Amino acid sequence: MPLNAVRVASKAQPAKNVILVFHGLGDSGSGWSFLAEYLQRSPAFAHTRFVFPNAPNMRIDANGGMSMPAWFNIYDWANPDARVDVEGIKSSLKVINSFIQEQIDDGISPENIILGGFSQGAALTLASTVTSPYKLGGFFALSGFCRLKKEDLDSIAENKNKDTPVFHGHGDQDPIIPIQYGSDAKKFFEKYFHLSDYDFKSYRGMAHSTSLEEMQDLVQFLSKALKL
């Protein structure tokens, strides 16, 4: 079955790098396709292709059982100790691996692949720093969080990306995923999985969104991670 995604070809051939971006709850791949246009303005990203996967529709308990695009279920927004859809997260981590393998099969080296996401997609990205069987070029998490416990990841941990750079940007006025959830995620992955290159940046006045300042920092991170 073909992998469902919005795909943006590299401006120049052949493609040498790939940036995979997983969207947030209720969104779609097209919601983040602006990132390709933004980055491809720079000649440095001419040989970079972009893939923006689309999540399937599923019932979200925290939204009254409404069906919407999601990578995993959310049971309760307000309670950080609420039930976590561990199996849903693990299932989506397999989807991520399928997208990565697709690019490798097409001749892209793993170290030239960047995995990133926003909100739910960022949560998957952070989990992938531990579970990915591939040594990637970098990870970026925008407004990300982690509600998994160490034991949830232990059984599927690969630990191939302990030294891989991670960029985590978060707004200090985020009403959906409070910035504390973001800083807690950094502590979690550094303490239990010994990530050694985890850069967490907060953005003053930013809500559950992105900003020009964050985008500029992301460009700098991607350029360094891909050696552009």
Swiss-Prot record:
Source organism: Kluyveromyces lactis (strain ATCC 8585 / CBS 2359 / DSM 70799 / NBRC 1267 / NRRL Y-1140 / WM37) (Yeast)
Location(s) in or outside the cell: Cytoplasm; Nucleus
Reaction(s) the record says it catalyses: S-hexadecanoyl-L-cysteinyl-[protein] + H2O = L-cysteinyl-[protein] + hexadecanoate + H(+)
PANTHER family membership: LYSOPHOSPHOLIPASE-LIKE PROTEIN 1, LYSOPHOSPHOLIPASE-RELATED
GO cellular component, one term: cytoplasm
UniProt family annotation: Belongs to the AB hydrolase superfamily. AB hydrolase 2 family.
EC number: 3.1.2.-, 3.1.2.22
Transmembrane segments: none
Protein name as it appears in the record: Acyl-protein thioesterase 1
Enzyme class name: hydrolase
The UniProt record lists the keyword Nucleus: yes
